[in-house]
Amino acid sequence: MADLAKIEEQLSSLTLMQAAELVKMLEEKWCVSAAAPVAVAAAGAAPAAEAVAEKTEFEIVLIAAGDKKVEVIKAVKDITGLGLIEAKKLVDEAPKLMKSNVKKAEAEEIKGKLEAAGAKVELK
C-alpha cells in the first residue's frame, strides 16, 4: 500500500502537460486508448439514431436582425440573391424561413455569415 500511496502522490504532482505525455506513453506501451468507451445503443433505439444522423438538408430560419439591421440586410441580399427591397422585407418579417433544402456545410457557412452580421439564425 505504501508504494501505491507514493505513486498517487507523484501523479498528483504532475502538471497537465506531463500527465498528457504520460497518458500517451502508456497508450503506446500497452497498445490501448484512453478514449471513453462508446455505449452501444439498444436495438429499439437504433432506427431513431440513424434518422437523426442521416439528416443532410436543413432550413435556415432568420430569427431576428439584431442591432446591426443594415449589415444583416446586406448579408441576406448577398446570400439569397434577392434585391435590396426584398432582402429588407425578409429581414423585417423575421422570424422567417430564408432558405430550405440546404446541405449541412452550406447551412453552417450561411449561419456563420448571418451571425457575423449580427443576426440570430436557427437551422432546422
Swiss-Prot record:
A Pfam family found in this protein is Ribosomal_L12_N
The alphabetized UniProt keywords are: Ribonucleoprotein, Ribosomal protein
Query: What role does it play?
Result: Forms part of the ribosomal stalk which helps the ribosome interact with GTP-bound translation factors. Is thus essential for accurate translation.
Record's Gene3D superfamilies? 3.30.1390.10, Single helix bin
Q: What InterPro entries does the entry give?
A: Ribosomal_bL12, Ribosomal_bL12_C, Ribosomal_bL12_C/ClpS-like, Ribosomal_bL12_oligo, Ribosomal_bL12_oligo_N_sf
Task: Give the source lineage, highest ranks first.
Answer: Bacteria, Pseudomonadati, Pseudomonadota, Alphaproteobacteria, Rickettsiales
Q: What's a single GO CC term here?
A: cytoplasm
Task: Indicate the quaternary assembly.
Answer: Homodimer. Part of the ribosomal stalk of the 50S ribosomal subunit. Forms a multimeric L10(L12)X complex, where L10 forms an elongated spine to which 2 to 4 L12 dimers bind in a sequential fashion. Binds GTP-bound translation factors.
Q: Which domain of life is it from?
A: Bacteria
Species in which this protein is naturally found:
Rickettsia akari (strain Hartford)
Q: Which PANTHER family match?
A: 39S RIBOSOMAL PROTEIN L12 (PTHR45987), LARGE RIBOSOMAL SUBUNIT PROTEIN BL12M (PTHR45987:SF4)
Molecular function, one GO term: mRNA binding
Query: Gene encoding this polypeptide?
Result: rplL
Q: Which family does it belong to?
A: Belongs to the bacterial ribosomal protein bL12 family.
> What is this protein identified as?
Large ribosomal subunit protein bL12
Single Gene Ontology BP term?
Answer: translation
